[in-house]
């Protein structure tokens, strides 16, 4: 299952410190939680969506309601909570492990259908919301070489482009059978 967390951050004075915390402390803590298999963080390029996006591969919603998640990952950023805006969480199914996006690539998300991505010569993966907010209900994601990113910027309101802020972290624990698609 793909777990997404999106948000913006409203305090420019502490945003760099927030980013260090999230990328250097929170993501490694999350990947240590049983049931988390991959984690990667992104920053949007452009407007019309939350600034930050984290994409995780997890075993299912039970991981997010467990004690280990509460202890190591969930809710451990009370210091920053007042500055977090436009916060959204979703669980999506149907693609297996989240693809790793390299430093010289961009992640493209589209909620209006796969056609814009296919027309760009990309191979979109379909995401179907299964829990939490369930909005957008369907999304398509694809990986774009960085040199082609200018083709996407400001072309369509329904395409959102993201640059990776971190490498994809991976757990040493095996994926559940359902995740190995």
Where are the regions a protein language model picked out?
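Macromolecular interaction modules
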Residues: 1-181
């Amino acid at each position: 299952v793909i777990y997404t967390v999106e948000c913006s951050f409203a305090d420019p004075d502490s945003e760099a410190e927030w980013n260090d915390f999230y990328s250097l402390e929170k993501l490694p803590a999350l990947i240590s939680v049983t049931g988390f298999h991959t984690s990667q963080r992104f920053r949007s390029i452009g407007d019309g969506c939350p600034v930050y996006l984290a994409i995780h591969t997890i075993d299912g919603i039970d991981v997010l309601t467990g004690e280990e998640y509460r202890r190591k990952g969930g809710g451990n950023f009370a210091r920053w909570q007042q500055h977090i805006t436009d916060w959204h969480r979703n669980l999506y199914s149907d693609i297996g492990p989240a693809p790793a996006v390299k430093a010289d690539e961009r992640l493209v998300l589209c909620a209006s259908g796969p056609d814009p991505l296919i027309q760009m010569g990309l191979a979109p993966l379909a995401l179907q919301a299964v829990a939490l907010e369930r909005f957008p209900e369907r999304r398509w994601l694809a990986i774009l070489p960085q040199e082609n990113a200018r083709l996407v910027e400001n072309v369509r309101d329904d395409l959102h482009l993201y640059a990776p802020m971190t490498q994809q972290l991976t757990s040493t624990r095996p994926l559940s059978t359902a995740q190995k698609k």
